[in-house]
Amino acid sequence: VHWSAEEKQLITGLWGKVNVAECGAEALARLLIVYPWTQRFFASFGNLSSPTAILGNPMVRAHGKKVLTSFGDAVKNLDNIKNTFSQLSELHCDKLHVDPENFRLLGDILIIVLAAHFTKDFTPECQAAWQKLVRVVAHALARKYH
């Protein structure tokens, strides 16, 4: 994947403003609420019975932070995303059996969360760069499935 200097700047510039705990928790909670079938991968998280329960669930918040922290590894390694996520791809494929389509869904949700948090900074150009990034990350995570 080739990244232009402008794309790199738009991605890293916005990433520097992201509250990983807050945005990660919101992104994962939105995934579980908007796409309820994804909840089956989080059965051990306890109460996911309603949007309020999901938003208040400490395990959802903690895992959301973990997910977005790992997404930060992509931002730091834009030129080596495939290798950055090879172990996570293996884990999600071989051990957790997560449907790779869920990576795309989470990427789309992350775009919505970023747009909601950074209305002025999230220009169409910024969105295009981030859309490319979430697509590349989803593809890297789905790699072991092919």
From Swiss-Prot:
Which keywords, in A-to-Z order, does the entry hold?
Answer: Heme, Iron, Metal-binding, Oxygen transport, Transport
Q: Which GO terms describe its cellular component?
A: blood microparticle; haptoglobin-hemoglobin complex; hemoglobin complex
GO MF annotations, alphabetized: haptoglobin binding; heme binding; metal ion binding; organic acid binding; oxygen binding; oxygen carrier activity; peroxidase activity
Domain Globin span(s) in chain numbering: 2-146
Tissue expression per record = Red blood cells.
Which GO BP terms, alphabetically? hydrogen peroxide catabolic process
Top-down, what is the taxonomic lineage of the species of origin? Eukaryota, Metazoa, Chordata, Craniata, Vertebrata
Please give the SUPFAM superfamilies that the UniProt record associates with this protein: Globin-like
Q: Which family does it belong to?
A: Belongs to the globin family.
InterPro entries attached here? Globin, Globin-like_sf, Globin/Proto, Hemoglobin_b, Hemoglobin_oxygen_transport
Fill in the subunit field for this protein. Answer: Heterotetramer of two alpha chains and two beta chains.
- Full protein name: Hemoglobin subunit beta
Residues noted as binding heme b in the record, renumbered to the chain: H63, H92
- Annotated signal sequence is none
Q: Does the keyword Zinc-finger apply?
A: no
Annotated function: Involved in oxygen transport from the lung to the various peripheral tissues.
Leftover remarks: This beta chain is from both the minor and the major components, which have been called the Q-I the Q-II component, respectively.
Q: Does Heme appear among the keywords?
A: yes
